[in-house]
Amino acid sequence: MTPFLYRIAQAFYKKYGNEISRLAFVFPNRRSGIFFQKYLAEVSGKPIFSPKVTTINDLMAELSPYTLIDRISLLVTLYKKYIELRKSDETFDNFVFWGDMLLGDFDDVDKYMVDARQLFTNIHDLKEIDEFYLTEEQIEIVKRFWGHLFFPSTESDNKQQFIQLWQILFDLYTGLRDELSSRNKAYEGMIFRDVAERSKRKESINLPYTQVVFIGFNAITEAEKIFMEYLRDIGIGDFYWDYYAPTLQDSYNKAAFFLNDNKRRFPSKIEIDEHIEQTPQIELISIPSAVGQAKQATDILQSLIDNNHLSPEKAINTAIVLPDEELLLPMLYSIPPEISTVNTTMGYTLQHTTVAAL
């Protein structure tokens, strides 16, 4: 099977040759870009000047006048703005958990170009929150949620705290944006929205590339869509979708509707040989323990190596997806000795390290 990224590299090098250095290739994540560069080196067979290989996040940041702020500084800024608006004595420790959730919501609001004023409408302009409209299960969930955040003592406090927060959400959102903008800082969604709004106004965006090629995207946000439409309309946007799995060709598959819409709205300039993949074979194995899962994965790898179905030198093409980060170390210690190099792309919480036990 020829990998999708290999076929992309092959097609573009065939058309552009050494001039490929004048192009920019945009991927949804860094890992895709690394493999693309690897395949491009294989295709060229000689040293060449590399094209720009970047992620959509990095490209947006490159085109925005704002500097991306780190998460901790962002939380502190939000906390100060919250205390100012709420006139509250809430501690930062108690704020961090749900403040991080609010930042996620603000990020989504901007990436999906939502009208924040309408979304964060004052709760008094909506129906009064009344337990009459909720099931007992919903009531219990609301109580548990707000109880964790504010530790209310009565049922009326649940409603009151909720109303008070909703009263300031829009001011909190705009206040945070204004504060960051005054410091020439921004969170990721704010950067996306800035670039998208400029694209929507057809402002000139200085791009030092003859073509900007988007590869391997799936679900795209509204801000990304507007930016991609802008590049398409000025003639430098090019798009390639890895939508060849049999399940995605099924017209009755609801996901296929959105995927086909992407292909229709953002067509490819170069024809890439479509490789229709076979339906994957899936085998389920019941394992009673977490460590046993790592051991079973090791046994499978060893069996593949022993039967010449897996070359240790090309093990990079084999993926092991763990259901829990706690399995990372048992898995790494169990890798067959024939495999000398692994690429790990998952986090490992501090609470599971030996340092946390000190």
Residue spans of the language-model regions?
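Nucleic acid-machinery interaction/catalytic patches
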Residues: M1-L358
